[in-house]
């Protein structure tokens, strides 16, 4: 699983600026999804082939006793507990503050690797910036400018060396014989533990707990109708005897890690509650990660016809960017609708891993263009020549041609829908990339 970097510090030291710099490469992936809201406290970054999750904890007041500062402090402590590395940010312009000492005292007791980072150091000599902060007892301070990027690359590379060194071997979790890897995610109390037990029930369980690649992760292998599956870190579920129960604390970090590690995500919603921003945030991360998705609307048996119509309308309105995914209305407690849900899991995985031959893709593209040509932009009309597959999980379709900058978002959606229909790509995000043609025959005939 991806390691977690937690950004910690008192208010206004530049945590959000550093967060935005570390996660900027991810922004464009979800910018054009209608209806998607984003939680800016959690994001993903990547250095070369090493991805990581980064958490912006908000201003930390470790001694706060009540109110919003106490709540923020509690959330920060949880993020630190789950982090592989903590980046403790202080302000080089304003110097050492009493709050910095309180935070340092707390962090030393956690046992986590701590990187002391002095921000806003642009234009200042290292000795002038760093001297005050040695008394925190956290080793050599690293001077950076989050706003200008100075020193950030070296700092995050060092942090990732430590974070990845603490990651156990991943061979077992990547073993293809374990079957489709499923993450069941959702808000607290939507019925995740009930669904897990319905899936692996005592008579079917071929389950064993395995230490995962992060603290407290679990992997549970099971078979259903002769097919193998693996449940990965079910984000707040732990075994008690033969049954899984929800633990008291909902972990966003573990939810994001399990999504990243899954082949297919089941997003579980509560039919008796309106869809929340948190539901949309989780769904948005699934799309951003390119994971196959099935939606389960639980506790459906407790609704009358009017409430069911209202719940369906709420789903369509608030999660319209998930129109590629199938929705199932289930009762995990009564085990109704679960067979169809799992068939959609199989279908979504098959779609995500589909192989799309170049001749068929190109034919589908040409037929789509013949049915509806892209609009002109001034005197220019885009010419779409041919298509090939650029990747799987999620499928990536690369389209070659000329004047491709003039292709509108509306036309991209049209092409996406045509490809989905032609190749039965239900349940998986679909990426389309346009490239200027270097086909030597593109302009002939």
UniProtKB/Swiss-Prot annotation:
EngA-type G domain sequence ranges: 3-167, 180-353
CDD domains: EngA1 (cd01894), EngA2 (cd01895)
Residue numbers binding GTP 1: 9-16, 56-60, 119-122
Keyword Nucleotide-binding assigned: yes
Domain of life where this protein originates: Bacteria
Domain (KH-like): residue spans on this chain: 354-438
Keywords in alphabetical order: GTP-binding, Nucleotide-binding, Repeat, Ribosome biogenesis
Alphabetical list of InterPro entries matching this protein: AAA+_ATPase (IPR003593), G_ENGA (IPR031166), GTP-bd (IPR006073), GTPase_Der (IPR016484), KH_dom-like (IPR032859), KH_dom-like_a/b (IPR015946), P-loop_NTPase (IPR027417), Small_GTP-bd (IPR005225)
Protein's UniProt keywords contain Transcription: no
Binding site for GTP 2: 186-193, 233-237, 298-301
NCBIfam families: GTPase_EngA, small_GTP
Subunit structure: Associates with the 50S ribosomal subunit.
Family: Belongs to the TRAFAC class TrmE-Era-EngA-EngB-Septin-like GTPase superfamily. EngA (Der) GTPase family.
Name used for this protein in its record: GTPase Der
Organism: Burkholderia ambifaria (strain ATCC BAA-244 / DSM 16087 / CCUG 44356 / LMG 19182 / AMMD)
């Amino acid at each position: 699983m991806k390691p977690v970097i937690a950004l910690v510090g008192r208010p206004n030291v530049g945590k959000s600026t550093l967060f935005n710099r570390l996660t900027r490469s991810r922004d464009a992936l979800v910018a054009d999804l209608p209806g998607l809201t984003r939680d800016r406290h959690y994001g993903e970054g990547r250095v070369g082939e090493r991805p990581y999750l980064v958490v912006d904890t908000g201003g930390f007041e470790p001694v706060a006793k009540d109110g919003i500062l106490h709540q923020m402090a509690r959330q920060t402590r949880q993020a630190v507990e789950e982090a592989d590395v903590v980046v403790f940010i202080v302000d080089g312009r304003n110097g050492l503050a009493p709050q910095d000492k309180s935070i340092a005292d707390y962090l030393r007791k956690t046992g986590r690797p701590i990187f002391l980072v002095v921000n806003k150091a642009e234009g200042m000599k290292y000795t002038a910036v760093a001297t005050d902060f040695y008394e925190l007892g956290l080793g050599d301070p690293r001077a950076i400018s989050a706003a200008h990027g100075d020193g950030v690359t070296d700092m995050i590379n060092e942090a990732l060396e430590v974070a990845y060194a603490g990651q156990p071997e991943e061979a077992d979790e990547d073993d293809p014989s374990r079957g489709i890897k499923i993450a069941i995610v959702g808000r607290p109390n939507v019925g995740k533990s009930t669904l897990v037990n319905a899936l692996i029930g005592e008579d079917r369980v071929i389950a064993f707990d395995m230490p995962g690649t992060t603290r407290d992760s679990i992997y549970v292998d099971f078979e259903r109708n002769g097919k193998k599956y693996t449940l990965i870190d079910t984000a707040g579920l732990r075994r008690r005897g033969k049954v899984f129960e929800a633990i008291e604390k909902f972990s966003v970090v573990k939810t994001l890690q399990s999504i990243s590690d899954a082949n297919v995500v089941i997003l579980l919603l509560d039919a008796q509650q309106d869809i929340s921003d948190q539901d949309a945030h989780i769904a948005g991360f699934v799309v951003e990660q390119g994971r196959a998705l099935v939606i389960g609307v639980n506790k459906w048996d407790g609704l009358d016809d009017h409430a069911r119509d209202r719940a369906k309308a709420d789903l369509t309105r608030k999660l319209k960017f998930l129109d590629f995914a199938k929705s199932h209305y289930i009762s995990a407690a009564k085990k109704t609708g679960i067979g169809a849900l799992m068939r959609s899991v199989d279908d979504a995985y098959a779609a995500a891993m589909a192989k799309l031959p170049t001749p068929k893709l190109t034919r589908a593209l040409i037929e789509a263009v013949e049915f509806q040509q892209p609009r002109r932009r001034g005197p220019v009309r885009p010419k779409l020549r041919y298509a090939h597959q650029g990747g799987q999980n999620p499928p990536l379709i690369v389209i070659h041609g000329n004047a491709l900058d003039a292709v509108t978002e509306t036309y991209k959606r049209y092409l996406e829908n045509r490809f989905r229909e032609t190749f039965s790509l239900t349940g998986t995000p679909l990426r389309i990339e346009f490239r200027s043609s270097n086909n030597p025959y593109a302009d002939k005939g």
